[in-house]
């Protein structure tokens, strides 16, 4: 279930037009992504900042890691989409909508990794958790009981 406490009001802080940031993907390839600005938010009295990808007037794409990465959520991080900031730069960060990247489900996907700036010293307990493939779950690994014959 969604946790309303993880719907947090953020503030979009724009960068100069045309700014990009290097993004490394899971296989080590680096590419430049449009970086229109960052989103700042507060949680438990601390201010956090996440660099965003996308276009300045559109939806923002966030690639982040937090203290649950590898401890309840996908180790390489999670993705989150946000609506475009309003005219005052306000944007709602709904961490309930944080999701695992495609590479969490298949080794055939390449995914961007969170840049160092987006590795948060915060445990985001909302959103998608670690995916366990049915063939690797403990139920699938345990032997099935068979009926014995007299």
Regions from the PLM with identified roles:
Residues 67-72, 81-85, 90-92, 96-150:
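Extended, aromatic/histidine-rich regions of cofactor-dependent oxidoreductases associated
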């Amino acid at each position: 279930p969604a946790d309303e406490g993880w719907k947090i009001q953020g503030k979009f802080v724009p960068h100069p037009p045309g700014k990009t940031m290097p993004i490394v993907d899971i296989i080590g390839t680096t590419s430049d992504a449009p970086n229109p600005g960052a989103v700042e938010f507060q949680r438990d009295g601390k201010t956090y900042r996440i660099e965003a990808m996308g276009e300045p007037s559109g939806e923002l794409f966030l690639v982040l890691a937090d203290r649950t990465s590898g401890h309840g959520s996908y180790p390489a991080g999670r993705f989150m989409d946000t609506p475009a900031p309003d005219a005052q730069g306000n944007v709602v960060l709904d961490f309930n909508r944080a999701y695992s990247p495609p590479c969490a489900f298949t080794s055939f996907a390449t995914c961007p990794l969170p840049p160092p700036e987006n590795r948060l010293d915060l445990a985001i307990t909302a959103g998608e958790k670690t995916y366990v493939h049915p063939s690797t779950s403990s139920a699938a690994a345990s032997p099935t009981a068979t009926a014995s014959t007299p």
